[in-house]
Amino acid sequence: MFLFLFVAVFTASPLWAAEPTAKIHGILINADSMFRDTEKETAELEGNVQIVYQGQHIRSDKARVLLRSRQVELFGNVEIMDAKNTIVGDQVYLDYENNTGVIYNGYVQSGSITFSGTVLQKTGDAEYVVSSADYTACTNCPSTWSFSGTTVRAELGGYAYIKNAILRFGPVPVFWFPYLVVPLKSDRQSGLLTPTFEASDTGGFAMSLPYFWAISRSSDATIELKDYANRGLKGLLEYRYMLNENSEGSLNFGSLFDKAFADDERLNLYRPVTEKNDPIERYFVRYGHYLEMPDGGVHRAQINFASDLQYPKDFPTETLNHGDSAMENRVSYTKNTEDQHMSVDSSYYVNMLHGDPLAGNNDAVHRIPELRWSHSQQNIGESNFIYAFDLDVVNFTRGGNAYDDMTTQTSGDTTVRFPKNSCNDPKWEDNPLCKRVYDGSFDPSVDLIRTGQRIDFEPSVYYPIKLADGLDLVPAMSYRETHYNFNIEDNSHVVRRYLRAEMGARLSLSRVYGDTVSSKATRYKHEIIPEVTYSNLPWFTQDDSPFFGQGSVTDAPYSARDSITDLDIASDYSVQFDYNDRVYDRNLVTMALTNKVTEKRWVSDRPEYRQIGYLKLAQSYDASQQNRGGSIYEPWSDLTATLDVRLDRFQTYSIFNYFPYQNVTNASSRVRLMNDVGQFFQVQLTRQYKITPGQAVDTSARQEDYTFSTGFVSKYLNLMGKFVYDANWADRSSGDQIKSWAYIAQFKPTGDCLFITFIHDQVTGGDTNFKLNFAFTFDGVPKAPLPPETLDSYGF
């Protein structure tokens, strides 16, 4: 009897209960109880079932393995995991050889991407067809957002195609799409992006729908249609490319037939009656290019152009130059070697200061072309003599006349020089009835030369002398020769030559603070550097020319730190092409005192140096003023203080210029507090007075702006804002006390799958704008928050 039972059991259904783990046909199996039918080549598993095969780990309450067909039937709390994905369901039929199957009442999860449905067909390693499906990339439950559809065909690492898609926020249905394609990978891929909603005073409500085109591995584009309720339909393009690891470029273009601009008061003020209130086509082009070439040269291009002068104010985030006096368009090729610099450069400018937004550009002066060749300081043979030279050739050109017909008006002690016009008014451009007048004859006493060619050559020789440790003396001599060619009769060629002698003395005192015993301790080096420089022109010759004004050549009051301002136009020394046309520091002593603090700290096993503190005080004394005539005697220059502090949580960069004879201080100062989280607070001051030697300062005409910026970062909310306060608002006849402002709020609901960005801003003199954008994380990779620099793009 015992023998009969033994034979019967072991020929029908062998029992492995005594051995709960086994390996069959490359499959590792473990369960509370396991039965195998060798004839049918099946195995019945029950209780804490675990199956491992080719990187897949399968768990269930019960399973039936079909060894002949390489399939497994799983029941109850089924979970299939591999290195990338997890499959969970009530019941699963799996072809473990081909990695296909059917999942009932389950879901598939890859990272934070989850698909769930009543029936999920696994058609490949990462391909699924889901019925009565839900899709989300949120990590929370219930999910912040999801798409439900009758059918979803998904390829993990590719796309999901959803039929009858319904967007839900939480359980609430929001929008229905008949068909939707969403990306399931973080790689660049073509597809529609989420729409953006905007509203502005002039444009009205607007909705834009962008399409991202992944052209190749090194180029892509965003094509966008934006429909304004008041302006009309606008097309936008942004094309980006990379040419090599260090070379890239981008092209931005936009165009619309603007109906709202047709009613603009400024535009219609200058238009003929027959054209008033007619819509016009508006556009912009912005292009940036940087290319490192095989010969070691660098090709750069910067193009910024718009159809009208008001475009940057109406669309400040497109041209990115609202408030600038000119649009600069520049193309250059530069090549630097160990001791030389060579460049070919061309700059085309668009004058943005006209009253008429459709004004021409004939009065703008361009630099086309400009050639530079410089040789850096290098020893002469084996001696201590060092030489250097600079050569600059530039052609100044424009579409209009070679000179400006000018006239003057005097009121009290103030003389104003301005273009001759039919109204004889310095503010003639504000009146559309006023026109410029050209009499066809150059008047050297008042007219202004605007075009010509300049060749500038300057060799220099130095002889550094080390008197002691930390004490250096550097005598220098340079010769400068400049040739001008003007398109003006009787004033066609001008030459200027001079010698400059300089003597610089510098003392460096330093001390190291901190732990000097440990080799990897943090240390600080404090340097105090007093220095004195004397500059003199022992020989100077210059041809008489109205280009340099009517004042005495030897009395020109320029120093190297004086900038060109509008006040120069009416001065006795006129205004030239640029700063290089000035002769400065004729007999000048400059004294400076510099303090520097440098930190040395160790990052891992590598030393890191950074300058954490810098303070420089400088002032000059012009000895040549003693020999000048006139009633103005102001030999001391402004006292300049430059402060630069860069700590982990505190930064400031400030420049102060105190003018002793006017008793006022120009300031440009920024103070910033921040932490490691990304939160910050910043205050910036810009204060500028118009300084005229010998005259009192009109404080009511000053520019004094305070800019306040702050940023707050938290788990669910990011906030940052900025506004500019005009401290001189009460003394102005027009303008707002708050000149411009912007704030950005980013809401981050739970689940790391959605950014809701709200932007509210107003540029100086422009519209109030609202912008709302939803940034969904379809691929499961959370989006980074906007950096604080984003505020700078809103046309302050």
What are these regions (language model features)?
Residues 1-12:
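Bacterial N-terminal signal peptides
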Residues 10-12, 16, 151, 718:
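A generic structural signal for solvent-exposed, polar alpha-helical segments
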Residues 17-132, 146-149, 153-154, 159-164, ...:
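N-terminal amphipathic/hydrophobic interface segments
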Residues 91-93, 100, 108-129, 133-135, ...:
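Outer-membrane beta-barrel proteins and related beta-barrel translocases across Gram-negative bacteria
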